[in-house]
Amino acid sequence: EPLRRCFIMLGTYFYNKRVRTSVSIFGSLFNDIHVLRTDSNGKVLSQVKVPLSYAPKRSFLERLEEMSQGEEAERRVAIKLPRMSFEIIGINYDPQRQLPKMNTFNAAPIGERKDLYTGVPYILSFQLAVYAKSQDDALQVVEQIIPYFAPQYTLSVKPFSDLPDIVEDIPVTLTGVDFQDDYEGSFEARRALIYTLRFTAKTYLFGSIADTSEGLIRKVQA
């Protein structure tokens, strides 16, 4: 019977947006980063918010390469630094957190019943790239991020919009930081410094939610 129910459920449409939501929440961690511009005396001249976008790192590298081809190309590409980009780079099953697959629990308020099978644990891998023209700008951004991950930062989210009582904790771990400055031109012609921060997030993917309220006993008379 459990096996039969599994095959039936494979034909049931559902979309819980777990990966999409995780990507959005991850990006929101870094959407309020600023750098300060100061004079030689340390007086703040301006504060610049660092733009953040979801995009593959390689697309920014291509645009930075175009910028190095002269002022006309730089105006055409129109990319301003510093800035950041992030992307999801992996979705991997995590067997160490797997609970019995056929377990179900009631995910509905009192008086209703919606059965939800145990979630399947996955590790989502992300990378965040920081692009800057100066080392000081790049380090201002990096040092506003790293201290919050020691090496883990936990996010609390509601995985189902129609089931607000369910809350999931998503541990986000900083796994490494890489530095790249491979431009072979003069110091003045350097196109960009790039820091790449790598993260993992532990979450669960869920199947369809079965509404089984019809079989509930609403009232018992003695």
PLM features per residue range, with description:
Residues 1-8:
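Short, Lys/Arg-enriched N-terminal segments with co-localized hydrophobic residues
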Residues 9-102:
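Small/polar-rich, solvent-exposed N-terminal microdomains that initiate assembly or binding
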Residues 10-13, 17, 91-92, 113-123, ...:
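Extracellular/virion structural assembly segments
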Residues 70-76, 110-118, 182-189:
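Catalytic micro-motifs at enzyme active sites that drive phosphoryl/nucleotidyl and oxygen chemistry
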Residues 82-90, 118-134, 143-145, 191-204:
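Oligomerization/assembly interface segments of phage tail-like spikes and tubes
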Residues 99-113:
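Conserved alpha/beta core surface patches that mediate binding of polyanionic ligands
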Residues 108-111, 215-222:
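Short, cationic low-complexity segments
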Residues 118-120, 140, 149-209, 214-216:
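Acidic-leaning, charged glycine-interspersed low-complexity segments
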